[in-house]
């Protein structure tokens, strides 16, 4: 299992991408949360509202998921960050495997 973290400029784009990834069975679930982001862009520090997405999936779907997020994402340079999960309860992992691409 892996967790993929990415951010979106608003709820609408986050929900659209997440629902597409769910329908395509590239992820088993997602958690969305609004937050403030501070970052460098074109030589200056910017501040914006963003929606962070925690996506849960299988390790073998990483490359396909990463490419699909790039295709769907509204940002020019989206953060698509993989976090390897070393341990997870067996029932959750079984559910995740059953709910993602066969």
UniProtKB/Swiss-Prot annotation:
Gene3D superfamilies: 3.30.70.120. The keyword Cytoplasm applies. Its cofactor is Cu cation. Cu cation binds at residue 48. It comes from the Archaea. Involved in resistance toward heavy metals. Homotrimer. The binding of the copper ion probably leads to oligomerization. This is Divalent-cation tolerance protein CutA. It comes from Pyrococcus horikoshii (strain ATCC 700860 / DSM 12428 / JCM 9974 / NBRC 100139 / OT-3). The lineage of its organism: Archaea, Methanobacteriati, Methanobacteriota, Thermococci, Thermococcales.
């Amino acid at each position: 299992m892996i967790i993929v973290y990415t951010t979106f400029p608003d709820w609408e784009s986050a929900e659209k991408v997440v629902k597409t990834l769910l329908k395509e069975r590239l992820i088993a679930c997602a958690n969305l949360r609004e937050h403030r982001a501070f970052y460098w862009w074109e030589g200056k520090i910017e501040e914006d509202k963003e929606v962070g997405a925690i996506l849960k999936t299988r390790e073998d779907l990483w490359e396909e998921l990463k490419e699909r997020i790039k295709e769907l994402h509204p940002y020019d340079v989206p953060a698509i960050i993989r976090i390897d999960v070393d341990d997870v309860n067996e029932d959750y992992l079984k559910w995740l495997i059953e709910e993602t691409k066969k």
